[in-house]
Every structure is written in C-alpha cells, then in structure tokens.
A protein has these predicted regions:
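Accessory, usually C-terminal, subdomains that scaffold auxiliary metal cofactors
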Residues: 194-248
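Short hinge/gating elements
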Residues: 23-27, 155-158
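Intrinsic-disorder/low-complexity, polar/charged segments enriched in Ser/Thr/Lys/Arg/Asp/Glu/Gln
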Residues: 14-18, 48, 143-147, 194, ...
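A mid-sequence, solvent-exposed acidic-amphipathic segment
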Residues: 135-200
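Hydrophobic beta-strand-centered segment that forms part of the acyl-chain substrate-binding groove
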Residues: 25, 29, 37-69, 175-209
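Residue-level detector of beta-strand face positions
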Residues: 50, 72-74, 226-228
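Non-catalytic linker/capping segments at the edges of enzyme domains
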Residues: 1-18, 70-162
Length: 248
C-alpha cells in the first residue's frame, strides 16, 4: 500500500490555525471535498504528508488546524476530530504520463456524464460549470487508468504564485475514484478515507497539465489507487496514494 498506518498524536507545543471549507468546495452533498481538505491540513506540515479523514467535513463552519512541530496535525470542529495528519514518505510507483492531447481526448469518455454519484462535486461534478468547479472529467486511457487534461486558472494561486496545495490535492483526489470505478465497476458512492501526497514541482496557472489516476487493488469496502499531475514535458509535479471507502 502507498502509505503506512501508523498512529499519530499531538504531544508537543502546538500552533492553531483557523480553517473553513466553503460549501462551494464540496464533494458529497453538505461535506467538503476530501482532497481539498487534505491539502488545507497538509500545507501546515510540508510537501509530503499523510492525511486520514475520519468524519464528513463540515462546510461553511469554523474549524481549526492544530499542528505540532514534530510533524503531526489535526482538523478540529469544536471538540470533534475531523481528520488527522502527519509527515510521511510516499511509497508509490508512478507510471509515465501521456500527452496533453491524449488526456484532452479522454475527457469525452468520462463515465460521469451518464451516471455520477456526486454531480455537484467541486472537482469532477458535471453540474458545475468550469468557472465554478475544476471540471476534471477523466476518461479511460487503459485498464483501470484514467486521465484528464487540466489548465489551472488564476483562482487557484497562493501567495507564492503557484497553485495552492488545496487545489493540487483536489486534483489528486477524484481521478483515483474514477480509476477504481473503471477497474472494478464499483456501484454506489464511495469516499476518500486517506491520502498520502507528495508535491514535487510548482504548478502554475495557464500552463498545460495532465492528471492521471490508476487502480491499485481492492479489499472488501476499501479500494486503493494512485494519482499524479504531470507537466507538458511529462515530469511529475505531484503524486498521491489513496484509500477509498465504499459507503453505499
């Protein structure tokens, strides 16, 4: 599997950061998108982080990210822990990318055009226009492998001038789910349970990128996948391994 299952606990002096997931950045109805939330928490720890989502993510409400200098953090809603995080090394074999043109062509085969468990999802929802959502519509490019073209907009930029971790991790989220659907024919909704991501290179607005997802395995209600973002030269900008949990 592409991550460890080690427990992590806040034990040292911590720092607290206000956090909020706007309802616009939803995944399932009335819950924040998992990848967006992963990046929101993980940016407090660094460029290689494991985040475990434990409960549905409240939207339009006040939360806190409490971080420990030892490299652990938690997302809290009042006294309830929504997610936990720790620095972790990503162990994932990333396949070679495809061309932007190939990824753009794959969008036409996105199965979510016909049946979509969460059509209002910020990342892959077909009810979201591309000025309101990310519109990452991944189509099959191989057995259990999906891809989409992606040209980030200036909205995604952070203060450093690159696409923020929230949006990079969002891009690393849903393509993995669609790869699992393509490989295993999973019916009914399933949600992100854990993501371990690594940010390798800055991602910029207006540039051409390819996002790919590939299935890695399935055990009962859990399924495992990898995702990556590639630049126009095929170099990996970011990658993630994830566990998804079937809830329907």
């Amino acid at each position: 599997m592409p991550y460890s299952n080690a427990a992590h606990t806040l034990e040292n002096e911590t720092t607290s950061h206000a956090a909020r997931v706007a309802s616009r950045f939803c995944g399932p109805p009335h819950s924040g998108n998992g990848g967006y939330t992963v990046g929101m928490i993980g940016k407090r720890l660094g460029s290689e982080v494991e985040v475990t989502l434990k409960r549905p993510i409240p939207v339009d409400d006040h939360m806190q990210v409490v971080a420990d200098p030892a490299g652990v953090a938690a997302l809290l809603h009042a006294d309830t822990e929504i997610a936990s995080a720790r620095t972790a090394e990503l162990d994932l074999d990333v396949p070679d990318g495809i061309t932007f043109a190939e990824a753009a062509a794959a969008r036409a085969n996105f199965p979510g055009y016909k049946v979509h468990p969460f059509p209002n999802c910020y990342v892959c929802g077909t009810n979201r226009c591309c000025s309101d959502g990310m519109c990452l519509f991944t189509g099959s490019v191989g057995e259990g492998v999906v891809a989409s073209s992606w040209v980030p907009t200036a909205e995604f930029l952070n203060e450093e001038g690159g696409v923020g971790p929230e949006f990079i991790c969002a891009a690393l989220d849903c393509p993995g789910a669609w790869a699992l659907i393509a490989r295993y024919g999973i019916e009914g909704p399933f949600v992100l349970g854990r993501m371990t991501y690594r940010l390798d290179k800055p991602i910029y607005a207006g540039e051409r990128y390819v996002v790919m997802g590939w299935a890695l395995g399935r055990e009962g209600r859990k399924a495992f996948c990898g995702t990556a973002v590639y630049d126009a030269e095929g170099q990996v900008c970011a990658a993630a391994g994830a566990t998804w949990i079937q809830i329907g």
